[in-house]
């Protein structure tokens, strides 16, 4: 964190008394420059801080005793003084005997010490300024202790009453009593855009919040001082604080969040923060921004604390106000700030901190979430919320929708009247009922959620509702969030509800509430919960409190000792009850007491007389003209209460679905439960849907019957005499057709309705269920169409078809003849009575009650007698194969394949047969054959790798035809060349895209590009790694020039004079040097015939390496390169330098890549032997300093990009790239420095170019964390702002070439690393995944690279010349 934003505050033992609270101390910290006068450098400091310059803009506040003038200043006669009065007197903390005197006692006292708060005005200034500066804000005075000019404002404690707000107070001047006043040196408003005060008026800013505003100032000294430079007369000022109830938006959480209290002047006008309004009264106000809980007051705190409410001012005489001690604590760690301790403060914040650690780690709490009062949903970011005042109370509640508001009002409405108390089914308490459950045609009343959950668990009921917010889950798949609590599965609508349920369930208050509920239930009915009760299942005596309740078959609650006992008893009872008889009305399994025979021959059973009476009443209501009609067997299911019924249903059409209900009550409850809300057509309010009526073919929704009637009146008034009611579809519409039938004129909405009505009237219309013609008694409106049915039976069948289509009920015109015949016969039998169902009459039989025939099933068990008897086919039933060798070709007669005949089956078995082959040889070489054989045997090496390679080479040698050679020695020497040609000719897959390099024996890279500083002494050389060498800064060197054109490779030797002229030229990268060096090394090994002197050379020659690099396998190339880096010599026989060997290996790698060879000799695990040998050689490299001060090396950065050693195409290449950039730009040239690097210390930063004003991203790293204790060796490789600042290393974004941008590489590295490692402070370089591919989302593991691997990487990076050029460039730039 930038230190410029941190202020300090030094506290004394009187600080709590002076400040009154933390808010008073902190709210004055950022005060100053609010009025248009120039900033005054008026800072009072202790003697040790005098004559010290302040370069930053920190808010530094010191509190110390200041000797006031000997006499108090008189008041101006024409000014109105206003004093700041607290509601309670404050007491000194501890054993301090000083008591705050009253204002009357303060007036005559002189010579005492007063406390002064000096606040920095947030401007860069010198404390020893001595020139006079005019101040228009406050009266100046010069204390004797300091030379600085200090402005003081008096907040004196005096007698103040509501009736004397506008009256002047004669004794409100500066007092001389200790601890009696707070004096402010300079005041600055917290708003940057506040206009200045002129002519005694303060202009409030529009749309902005100001934490402190001062509109009128009265002089604290005598009138001889005169007015300010801007014409504003200095005046006394004070505070008139009024309590204000915050708005609903600010009341999100008690005591948390910003709150701007209202501002009121003396005249009573209220101003909110940010509103623009003139001040009509010269008496002004001060408003302080703080957080206040709504309708709450914190006990014991009456100061202007940001966490306490503003109490109403009770103005009492100061002699009755005791002083109250207040502690100032750290806002982060809550530790009290001691006397003399330095406090830190952030600009614009009222919080104090004990240290910079607490200041940086402190963060404001997030804005609290707003929840819907009804469903508890998070509505913090939801738009369109509803704020309503419920139950005529002063509090406002916030809801997510109108449905929640309606449900909340319905929930609160029973509380207005008398409580409907009933006895709970579970606990038996006579209390208010919260739940009613209809189960098995009985309503069970439950008093609480606990009893409701126990009821659900006992009866196995599952509710599709969220356990937290109660939201309806339409299906089981909707509640995928399941939480198992105490063996029970609780379903939730979303993961946030699961989290809230866990937090509420784990809260101690929740657990205490459950325990208190259980304890209260036990205490209220001890005789019930303490007695022993017999379990219904196992008949065991248990306490009633531990019993599990369940509804039995008789509809009453039965106790069980456990859930297992309850389930076993239900299973047993279900088996015995399966043969029982079900009551036709209440559907209970009980012994029938009454039977009724219907006219159609059906017999119904009833359990008691009440069921018979209810059944008769229901049947008579549905019978036309009082005639009894037998109820139908078709049962509909109510969509709300889930009960079965056989009467005409109530229909609700909503969202292209038709819902059926058994009654109007269920329909209304369903609408409320599922929030079926729409805009009423009449009142234009969003309310629960009552009914939808068609008007002129358009559906109009209404919220009540009254709105529907009123809309009908308005509709009829608009149409006048043309408004009619259609006799067919019953809608109110404009007259469309008229028809006279039997002398009655009927009106219709259209010709179609008129035609359909005539068909119905003349009985020509068909039933929409059974498709039969005749009298259609029932009609309903289904999906906007009128449906007619024969009777209620067809109506119920039609509704069943809509729920579960049954093809047997779909009768088409093909049954017309049968239907007419049935109809005719029924008409003759019953006369004018309506025809019953077309189902045939059922055969009637007598039934005996309580008589059950005893039946027994007798079966004959026939067991066959088994006997085993051998036969011909039983023996040797498995086929046995016998090999019979038969020479081929030969004819083998095969008999006919019978079931008992074995036949031979030919099988081919290859057998190797040694065949001697004789090769001709010249007569002159026959004597050398034994010696050659012995020589070949001696070539066998003890090294397993050499033996394997020798075997492979011998196999290739046999294919090349060594017998055609003139002698054995020439065969051994020329085998490599012949094998290379054969391999290139026989393998068409390996096609070189790069031209072959001709062999040049005198080509030498160190001659073509010599080191220009070889004549320098060894003292100019230094050992690597040079960790921040200070010797570079002590001797400034000229800036390195731009690299010139690259010179071409030439043959032969050149003198050092010629090479020194071109020492600054960059070396061209040509792979021909590496390939030519390989060929030179292979030919040298082949021509060396002294095999007995060098054992290692003899073993290598047995591998028979070839000049063509592409003809070797990975193992051969690994072995050859390992020996190549150790044995390669210049054409003159001298050793190559380590950087030259690295250059040659890079050329070999480029040749392999250009020839479509995917091997990477520096990264692949197959070249581990070569990498170890190369690292040993590179460790001995010691760079030399050229005369121009640059470092000499033949390896450059561009070479590594060309051969893909750097880049983001693979995990290892990306890791090498980051390692190279950190070494180049951060100056990390030791392994210890790289190990100090971590994800937490490298961060992205935006840097602005002061010339082009262009922002560029960069990676920043602090030198102090990098160097540790190596301060004496550090150099500023990063840019510094000041010499005394710590240097900062940066890797600036490369916009010219994004593929080589350090910032892009770092972002790619973060994206391919595990996410949980981004802020770790102990790791930066991660181990690559062994099985990861380039398409994998994660390339690295959470394990850091070992030290050995980092050392090998550092050895290669330090040979690159560009890392030293980068250092020299930045050094020269800093010296400019």
Swiss-Prot record:
Q: Pfam families of this UniProt entry?
A: DUF3504, zf-FCS
**Which parts of the sequence are annotated with region: Disordered?**
30-56, 85-158, 269-304, 1027-1063
Q: Which UniProt keywords apply?
A: Isopeptide bond, Metal-binding, Nucleus, Phosphoprotein, Repeat, Transcription, Transcription regulation, Ubl conjugation, Zinc, Zinc-finger
Q: Where is the composition biased (Basic residues)?
A: 1038-1049
Q: Which Gene Ontology molecular function entries are recorded, alphabetically?
A: ubiquitin conjugating enzyme binding; zinc ion binding
Tell me where the cross-link Glycyl lysine isopeptide (Lys-Gly) (interchain with G-Cter in SUMO2) is found.
Answer: 48, 88, 98, 104, 147, 253, 297, 312, 324, 347, 365, 416, 440, 490, 502, 512, 528, 531, 575, 602, 648, 657, 687, 699, 708, 763, 787, 811, 828
> Ranges of Polar residues compositional bias?
30-53, 127-138, 284-302
Zinc finger spans (MYM-type)? 326-362, 368-408, 420-455, 462-501, 532-569, 635-670, 722-757, 763-798
- UniProt entry tagged with the keyword Nucleus: yes
Where do Basic and acidic residues bias regions lie? 139-152
Q: Where in the cell is it found?
A: Nucleus
Q: What does this protein do?
A: Involved in the negative regulation of transcription.
* Name by which UniProt lists this protein: Zinc finger MYM-type protein 2
Task: State the encoding gene.
Answer: Zmym2
